[in-house]
């Protein structure tokens, strides 16, 4: 028997007020995004030393968070929700004067168990190369520095030296070893970090560190580039009967494609977990989240996710990935990363809706995930969604070329709750209702659900993307990457 039931719906969308735009309500924000996404810009005077971090966090609104249902509660705080973490975001002169903050810092009060996941692009940026080396040397880290404006990719030895000098200067200010400081960069490929501006801004950045919600919010804004919304989330749950928190922030809206995407992320938790288990858990969650999103099929040079575990919750120490406590923490980590990943896909350049592809009945999770990725990545599927065309043929074709064997007579496709294909054969369906389903999602920047079953196997997986609009071409024709 084939199963192709839609999963639970996710949380509602919430937006804070915009800086200087208190009369702009949530619906107006959504409509502005949906009609002409990158024409919607919110700039304010660059944050001065007297500006509060709460003001910095309102340069752009916060993204909607699409958390899966589970034994957790969404809480405020982002990367600072977990015990032991502080964050800050300031304007440091790396962007043009008057734009958003461009320097962010996340620190931990103790040696945090550290893990990272990085781009598969062979032209990896200098900060990616540095972080890989640092994590080979040390199992712990205390700080993550992020700059926006310059990617510091394809910059040769000089770009790598810029990383070493930046890390060394911050380590000195924080009284840490250089390998305890990690770094992420985003911006234009081929441009080195504006090192002078960065170094001059580090004292102010360190002095701005705060364990507050505002600290987390300002950091989440500072790492954005073409993003229209900042992405930040935190949850509270239990591991072994003890309350723990997991939080995170991410950026990305273009150059999004597995593996990883043009995205940066920082994940924090106060759970106690040993290094080997933590690194395995982080890779598993990345595979279920950031490696399952696609906007335009391009894989960036800078993709990085750094995950830090302070262990300050007082929870039981996790040293076996197969134990019950590890499974509890893994589920929390999956939820946070998937929430952030879906927000990135929702914010795809020029997009009017999020596309969520769910595949069931495969032989394994990995095989289901690969089929879901193929469908979510298909330019023809994405264009059909934008055109409000319930084109089941494009969905079936994408599933078929994913490289995963299945019998086409087992193929079943649903669009929302409308059955388009069953037993490998197209069905008679209400095209007007299906088109209206797509149209409504586009009007409110909502979610289009595509559900596919390929057999009776135990494997299921999801992938997320967005529709492909005229605005995507316009945005990327005008923006230098």
UniProtKB/Swiss-Prot annotation:
Matches recorded under InterPro entries: Arg_biosynth_ArgJ, ArgJ-like_dom_sf, ArgJ_beta_C
User: Site annotated as Involved in the stabilization of negative charge on the oxyanion by the formation of the oxyanion hole: where?
Assistant: 186-187
Where's the active site on this chain? 262 (nucleophile)
User: Is Acyltransferase given among the entry's keywords?
Assistant: yes
> PANTHER family per the record?
ARGININE BIOSYNTHESIS BIFUNCTIONAL PROTEIN ARGJ (PTHR23100), ARGININE BIOSYNTHESIS BIFUNCTIONAL PROTEIN ARGJ, MITOCHONDRIAL (PTHR23100:SF0)
> What biological processes does GO assign it?
L-arginine biosynthetic process; ornithine biosynthetic process
How does this protein assemble?
A: Heterodimer of an alpha and a beta chain.
Pathway field: Amino-acid biosynthesis; L-arginine biosynthesis; L-ornithine and N-acetyl-L-glutamate from L-glutamate and N(2)-acetyl-L-ornithine (cyclic): step 1/1; Amino-acid biosynthesis; L-arginine biosynthesis; N(2)-acetyl-L-ornithine from L-glutamate: step 1/4
What sections of the protein cross the membrane?
Answer: none
HAMAP family named among the record's database cross-references:
ArgJ (MF_01106)
Q: Give the EC number(s) under which this enzyme is classified.
A: 2.3.1.35, 2.3.1.1
Q: What is this protein called?
A: Arginine biosynthesis bifunctional protein ArgJ, chloroplastic
- Per UniProt, substrate binds at 225, 251, 262, 349, 476, 481
Q: Name one GO cellular component term.
A: chloroplast
User: Annotated site (Cleavage), which positions?
Assistant: 261-262
Q: CDD domains under this entry?
A: OAT
The organism's lineage?
A: Eukaryota, Viridiplantae, Streptophyta, Embryophyta, Tracheophyta
Further comment found in the protein's record: This protein may be expected to contain an N-terminal transit peptide but none has been predicted.
Q: Which locations, inside or outside the cell, does it occupy?
A: Plastid, Chloroplast
Recite the UniProt keywords alphabetically. Answer: Acyltransferase, Amino-acid biosynthesis, Arginine biosynthesis, Autocatalytic cleavage, Chloroplast, Multifunctional enzyme, Plastid, Transferase
**What role does it play?**
Catalyzes two activities which are involved in the cyclic version of arginine biosynthesis: the synthesis of acetylglutamate from glutamate and acetyl-CoA, and of ornithine by transacetylation between acetylornithine and glutamate.
Answer whether the UniProt record assigns the keyword Acyltransferase to this protein: yes
């Amino acid at each position: 028997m084939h199963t192709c039931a839609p999963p639970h719906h996710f949380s509602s969308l919430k937006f804070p007020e915009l800086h200087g735009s208190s009369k702009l309500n949530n619906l107006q924000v959504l409509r502005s995004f949906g009609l002409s996404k990158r024409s919607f810009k919110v700039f304010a005077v660059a944050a001065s030393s007297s500006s509060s971090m709460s003001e910095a966090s309102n340069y752009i609104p916060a993204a909607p968070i699409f958390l899966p249902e589970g034994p957790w509660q969404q809480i405020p705080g982002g990367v600072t929700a977990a015990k032991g973490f502080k964050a800050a975001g300031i304007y440091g002169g790396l962007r043009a004067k008057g734009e958003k903050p461009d320097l962010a810092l996340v620190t931990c009060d103790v040696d945090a168990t550290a893990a990272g996941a990085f781009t598969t692009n062979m032209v990896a940026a200098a900060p990616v190369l540095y972080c890989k080396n640092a994590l080979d040397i040390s199992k712990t880290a205390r700080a993550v520095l992020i700059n926006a404006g310059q990617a510091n990719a394809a910059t040769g030895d000089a770009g790598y030296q810029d990383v070493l000098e930046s890390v060394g200067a911050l380590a000195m200010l924080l009284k840490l070893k250089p390998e305890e400081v990690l770094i992420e960069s985003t911006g234009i490929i081929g441009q080195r970090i504006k090192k002078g501006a960065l170094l001059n801004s580090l004292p102010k950045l360190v002095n701005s560190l705060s364990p507050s919600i505002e600290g987390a919010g300002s950091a989440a804004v500072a790492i954005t580039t073409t993003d229209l919304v900042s992405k930040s989330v935190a949850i509270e749950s239990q591991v072994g009967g003890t309350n723990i928190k997991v939080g995170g922030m991410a950026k990305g809206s273009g150059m999004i494609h597995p593996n990883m995407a043009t995205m940066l992320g920082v994940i924090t938790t106060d759970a106690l977990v040993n290094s080997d288990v933590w690194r395995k858990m982080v890779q598993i969650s990345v595979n279920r989240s950031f490696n399952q999103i696609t906007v335009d099929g391009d894989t960036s040079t800078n993709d990085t996710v750094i995950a830090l575990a302070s262990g300050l919750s007082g929870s039981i120490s996790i040293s076996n990935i197969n134990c019950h406590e590890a499974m509890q923490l893994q589920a929390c980590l999956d939820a946070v990363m998937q929430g952030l990943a879906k927000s990135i896909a929702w914010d795809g350049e020029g997009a009017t809706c999020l596309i969520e592809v769910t595949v069931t009945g495969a032989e394994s999770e990995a095989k289901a995930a690969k089929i879901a990725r193929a469908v979510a990545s298909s330019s023809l599927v994405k264009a059909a969604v934008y055109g409000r065309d319930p084109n089941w043929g494009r969905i079936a074709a994408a599933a078929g070329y994913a490289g995963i064997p299945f019998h086409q007579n087992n193929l079943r496709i649903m669009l929302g709750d409308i059955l388009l294909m069953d037993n490998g054969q197209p069905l008679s369906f209400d095209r007007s209702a299906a088109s209206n389903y797509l149209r409504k999602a586009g009007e409110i920047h909502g979610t289009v659900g595509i559900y596919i079953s390929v057999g009776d196997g135990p494997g299921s997986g999801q992938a997320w993307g967005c529709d492909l609009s005229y605005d995507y071409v316009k945005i990327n024709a005008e923006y230098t990457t």
